[in-house]
Amino acid sequence: MSIALPPNTRVGAGTVISGDRVTEAQVFRKFASRLDPGLVIGAGCHLDGVCFNVGERGFVSIGDQCRFEEAFLIAEQEIQIGDRVTIGWRATIVDCDFHPLAPAERLTDVVACSPLADGAARLALACRPVVIEDDAWIGPNATILKGVRIGAGAFVEPGAVVVQDVPPRTRVLGNPARAIGSV
């Protein structure tokens, strides 16, 4: 079974997008970008079980020779990922708050996202682009939050929650993630 690509997706030579039958159905289920292109994936990548949750104005760019395993990419604005980046199982990269922070607005937004919405527009979300530079490694179950830049060659330990920029060749761990050494 092959995965059908949205028409506004560009994929480089030799790239494989795979998953079991359950994950194949999820890969582009929440891909709503109206940009053209809304997703660019470089050459020689292997993305297994990755879920693209991309809003109408969202854009995701992935460089060459990347390896992602069951990662979640959530973009209302922009996620840029460089070359030779590895992202481990169940890691989440998100460029926005999932919902507004104020309780009344959050409830309105949850309804807008539900089948009850009947086409209602979502409220504006606080968004800032995420950039992951070349040769970075993002461990399993790590979370990269909006506005963060992961420097070239940085190493994000499994389970880390990254809320601020990580300098190049720096190793981070924890919630919130903090530097524990260099690579």
Residue ranges and their predicted role:
Residues V156:
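Binuclear metal-ion centers of metallo-dependent hydrolases, dominated by the metallo-beta-lactamase
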Residues Q164:
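Short helix N-cap motif at coil->helix boundaries in the Bergerat
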Residues M1-D135, P140-G147, A152, P168, ...:
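Domain-scale signature associated with acetyltransferase and cell-envelope carbohydrate enzymes
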Residues V161:
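Conserved sequence/active-site signature of Rossmann-fold short-chain dehydrogenase/reductase
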